[in-house]
Amino acid sequence: MEPVTKWSPKQVVDWTRGLDDCLQQYVHKFEREKINGEQLLQISHQDLEELGVTRIGHQELVLEAVDLLCALNYGLETDNMKNLVLKLRASSHNLQNYISSRRKSPAYDGNTSRKAPNEFLTSVVELIGAAKALLAWLDRAPFTGITDFSVTKNKIIQLCLDLTTTVQKDCFVAEMEDKVLTVVKVLNGICDKTIRSTTDPVMSQCACLEEVHLPNIKPGEGLGMYIKSTYDGLHVITGTTENSPADRSQKIHAGDEVIQVNQQTVVGWQLKNLVKKLRENPTGVVLLLKKRPTGSFNFTPAPLKNLRWKPPLVQTSPPPATTQSPESTMDTSLKKEKSAILDLYIPPPPAVPYSPRDENGSFVYGGSSKCKQPLPGPKGSESPNSFLDQESRRRRFTIADSDQLPGYSVETNILPTKMREKTPSYGKPRPLSMPADGNWMGIVDPFARPRGHGRKAFVSTKMTSYMAIDGSALVPLRQKPRRKTQGFLTMSRRRISCKDLGHADCQGWLYKKKEKGSFLSNKWKKFWVILKGSSLYWYSNQMAEKADGFVNLPDFTVERASECKKKHAFKISHPQIKTFYFAAENVQEMNVWLNKLGSAVIHQESTTKDEECYSESEQEDPEIAAETPPPPHASQTQSLTAQQASSSSPSLSGTSYSFSSLENTVKTPSSFPSSLSKERQSLPDTVNSLSAAEDEGQPITFAVQVHSPVPSEAGIHKALENSFVTSESGFLNSLSSDDTSSLSSNHDHLTVPDKPAGSKIMDKEETKVSEDDEMEKLYKSLEQASLSPLGDRRPSTKKELRKSFVKRCKNPSINEKLHKIRTLNSTLKCKEHDLAMINQLLDDPKLTARKYREWKVMNTLLIQDIYQQQRASPAPDDTDDTPQELKKSPSSPSVENSI
């Protein structure tokens, strides 16, 4: 690879063409100035200002990409684990020595001052930058598979977070320094222990570059690579698909970084530009990959452990169309970027995955019945992929909704902190957020935060679309259109309240085992558990508005949990997903639950073979800081009922998935294509889908009732509450009246007839509840519309204003109107401010030429806007019109001439 310092101006221009879309307006300026590679690596804020890149955010985007080039050019042959640990140790020693020497000074004011000196803050930033450089290595293979390195990484992350929190506290500097010294001493101990106790040669090995040729790519086959891009433009391969061109090369492994594609450096590029470059030559691709050392503890990187799927066939189906996420805030270019990448992540899994077995080699009760004959082989490892059985029992399996980008990989054990990945930044450290934990499993959207908005904000790890089976096993996804036959809508199953579930097949208080119980706290928590059909919900109490967890029982197994020390415990497990442990108060209750759950599993297997397999939980939500103690057993009324499951599925009251927890919707591999085809719907689409389901004879439990004129407005609010912004409901009501006029003009009651007898009882109860709560609905509608009970407009709170910019409508046309209104309001405020400044100048009785010249220098942009408006406006026909122009527009340039 040619060094970046040897780049010609043409190579620099070619590299800038792949950067963020908002930077393309400056490409011609780089071309005009003929900047070479050496000048590019030394570019600064001042240089960018002279080039015409005036916006700070745009400058930061360019400098972030240049930082990656500097790391590639200067640190490739020198950086290794040992050097990075030594750099972290040196930074911590420097900070410790600075604090000690400062305290010895006679002018020390740490006990009286609350403002830390700049040198102190700079040393802290340098320490965190050195820690990030080390964590970027620990976050990838081969270090993610080694327990010692994983523990070290988690400790460093926690210490850096403590360090960041400490320097931001409002306290005396001496107290701040004491806490920083405590953190620094622990960091020094970790660094010393890592250097002394680790003798693995991988500590001294540097990364290397390797060129990979992928020839003879068949049309429609794709490359079979899984690529994850960081926010600043680093592209990491997270795995390959079996029997794909990338897999057949035997040179592409998880953790490799894509440096060049067809001799073009793509470091710092947008992912969609990388995909375009990969598709540039349909016959073959030449990749230059940066590989980490691979010699730790006999560790050799494998393409992935997703070999459970059969060799894929060449795809002939067209790429699916993605739908717009209702809560997404990304711009149009980023949405197009999703659909442009879908062809890279192929092929889809087969319809029938392997079936795991228990220790005796037999199929477990309640498991999948698609494979009946056991395979020959030794006991406990009868399938060629039996090693996955043990791994998957302690792993979680997540899958994103249909509008998320499929085919990304993640790992397990997420830390409940807001972090994101960052590559080692050489040169001046930048105050970025912490890199993500390497052994975690979550849902994070790499496109959820547009890069044009800067890089200082934290990005939640709950917003990336990933899918994995274990630490490195990936399953490619492909959306397939499928007609909806279920009688319920696609949304988070946990959004249904305990009261709305109606009659249940079995319900009562059960203990549920926490996934991560601390050493001293109780490992079991009491929940109100409801079994309805094939769905199992658990709530914190009987009046909860949202379930803490949800499991769709098909393909799960129900059996006694003999491995638990808790009495009367049983488990609901799936070898490819996870295991839930529950415990009853006595043997009778446990037997009732086992019978009911087993019947639900068997009944659903025989009736709905293509049913999706879900698991949602809020057990690990970061918002739940403290657990509420369960009510005393004496006050808990045990209401275990034994009723047959109705043929209808649980009624859901929304149309969009909720990804508010770290554990989200999960599905069995056999239902991936069908489950991903569910798209978000507007209200007309929802009514159409319900009508279609009604024609097919499917039970439907979703109804919208319209009563008197005032309650009808509340009903419309209730039906469309997920589609509109709360603080702007007054404006949205006028918009929604047009959208729903065709429905309301033809139907006074939006109901679904011909319901089965099993759901009539539930409907009667729901109708009774709706009649009883009519005033409550009306009050909530007034509250959502920011109106008082008397109809007066009440000011919006800060929380509502914040929500108005977070929530998004599902209707794109209304979204555009809302955005236009916000834009016009902002423009109006800006113009009013400019007008006030001009009026202040004109109303000054002591205005002189000197004051005006000073004002003109301070308001150069305003003067330029006035000149531009004057050029755009038609010239007056007569000189007599000048006084009228002055009266009409005091901001006209004629004011300047008169002065």
Swiss-Prot record:
Residues 613-624 have a biased composition (Acidic residues). The modification Phosphoserine is found at residues 383, 873. The keyword Amino-acid biosynthesis does not apply. Residues 503-602 form the PH domain. Residues 309-334, 347-390, 605-687, 735-770, 868-899 are annotated as: Disordered. One of its GO terms (cellular component) is cytoplasm. Residues 80-174 form the CRIC domain. SUPFAM superfamilies: PDZ domain-like, PH domain-like, SAM/Pointed domain. Residues 332-457 form the DUF1170 domain. Residues 663-676, 889-899 have a biased composition (Polar residues). Pfam families: CNK2_3_dom (PF06663), CRIC_ras_sig (PF10534), PDZ (PF00595), PH (PF00169), SAM_1 (PF00536). Required for hepatocyte growth factor (HGF)-dependent activation of Arf6 and HGF-stimulated cell migration. This is CNK3/IPCEF1 fusion protein. It comes from Homo sapiens (Human).
